Amino acid sequence: MARSYANIFLKGGEAVEQEQKWIRAIQRHGSREAAEHLIGVYYDEIYRFVYRQTGSREDALDLTQSIFIAALRSLPGYRAVKASFRTWLYRIAANKVIDARRRARPVPVPWEEA
């Protein structure tokens, strides 16, 4: 995304209110524009989190994309009363990183006697 929304968090309550508007627009109408705004706010932050966990630029890019796809698909079930969007998104990110590590772990092959 060329546009950065990093400063949105400096506005306090207005930022949270705007974020909730975007979430409702996605939940109710599948708003692509709202999804782009929401991704724009969190993309760099989530990418850095994943990169620190994986140490790989390629893996971080792939996982970050996967995280946002999963988040957008799961957004109809998101409830702000249970957790902030940021907390919810980080839980998805952490789970995706754990899943990737499990898949990357070598599978032991039983030793056969000759």
What are these regions (language model features)?
Residues P76-G77, R91-W111:
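Arg/Lys-rich amphipathic alpha helix in sigma70-family domain 2
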Residues R32, E36, R57-L61, K82:
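Alpha-helix N-cap/helix-initiation sites
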Residues Q27-R28, R52-G55, F68-K82, R103-R105:
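Sigma70-family region 2
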Residues M1-E45:
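N-terminal module of bacterial RNA polymerase sigma factors
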